[in-house]
Amino acid sequence: MVSDPRDELAAVPDIITTDGGEGFSAFAVSRWPGLVRLAFGLTGDRWMAEDIAQTALARAYVAWRRVSRADDPDAYLRRILVNASHRRFRARRVTEQPGDLPETPVDGPADLVGERAALLAALRQLPPRQRTVIVLRYWADLTDAQIAATLGCSPGTVRSQLSRALARLRESPALGEGDDG
């Protein structure tokens, strides 16, 4: 039995599967998985990540003429996503950390689950800007210049924020747990 291609879009919000702007639907559907991954790196929460990714796509939809004509539409979309993430955290002022990780499969040994939990806990302890720089560098694999464009700052600021974030992560008790030597 051949699967219906629409089944693959089940996780994609309806707003991005109805093309209101020429090319928006294809653009949004192709970027959806990466947006959710990036938002998850910023939030550590799967459901919040999907909400933020939807918000980013909704804002991109409204500004589709500008986004589609931008030199780098992906950078434009990343900036929308990062701004939406920062707005969400400012609005919520999260004081309680989620206790459970989402039930996503992990390839590899069971100890990777513990390492992943420790990394997410350590990332949650970073200030939002440092967490954003770490996620954009190591999860999205962006250069200093691309991160600077996304955050609206200089590459030097990106490097200093990255350096501070890495120093804090090295000192993090969450990442120190489980070290056997």
Residue ranges of each PLM-predicted region?
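A short, charge-rich alpha-helical start-of-domain segment used by transcription regulators
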Residues: V2-S3, D7, V12-R37, W47-E50
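Internal acidic/polar
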Residues: P5-L9, R87, V94-A121, T143, ...
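Conserved RNAP core-binding helix
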Residues: V36, R46-A63
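Structural recognition of an alpha-helix C-terminal capping motif at a helix-to-coil junction
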Residues: D51-A58, D71-N83
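Arg/Lys-rich amphipathic alpha helix in sigma70-family domain 2
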Residues: V62-R69, R79-G99, L112, E171
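DNA-recognition helix of helix-turn-helix
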Residues: V82, H86, L151-L175
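Helix-turn-helix DNA-binding module
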Residues: R124, P128, A140-T157, R168
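A short pre-motif secondary-structure segment
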Residues: V133-R137
